[in-house]
Amino acid sequence: EQVHYSDHPQLRREEIEDHLATVPTTFRGENVVFAVRDEIGAVIGFCWIVLFDPGTGLEGEVAEVYVSPEHRGRGVGEMLMQQAVRLFRERRVTLGYVWTRPDNEAAVRLYQSAGFENNRQLVLTWYPTEQ
């Protein structure tokens, strides 16, 4: 099972560090990253959160959660999501959300265990087509 909200389901260790270095420049708003490292200091998981105020109160998006395949099922994702929820509470976030595919059952369980609820929102996607 893959527990992640990411376009990068199988990042190599060196790619994780490079990916994390680009996070602060990706979205406008305040970017917060929690990382979990193993005993030798390699990143084994991370959670990227974007905080922003669209004029109706501070909102928080869990933009990406990643746990390396060999560390999945060991509580790393739960620890990261607990930190995300703690940050939302500390910062008095009025709305927190995360996006995932419905068929990513492990991610859905992870997010629900952290207190997120399925709001049945329909998201429509547009992709350019060749003309």
Describe each model-derived feature in a short phrase.
Residues 72, 97-108, 125-130:
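Conserved beta-strand-loop-alpha-helix junction that forms the acyl-donor binding cleft
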Residues 73-76, 103, 118-121:
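Short, structured secondary-structure boundary patches
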Residues 67, 73-86, 109-114:
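Conserved acetyl-CoA-binding loop-helix of GNAT-fold acetyltransferases
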Residues 1-58, 63, 68, 81-82, ...:
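Acetyl-CoA-dependent GNAT
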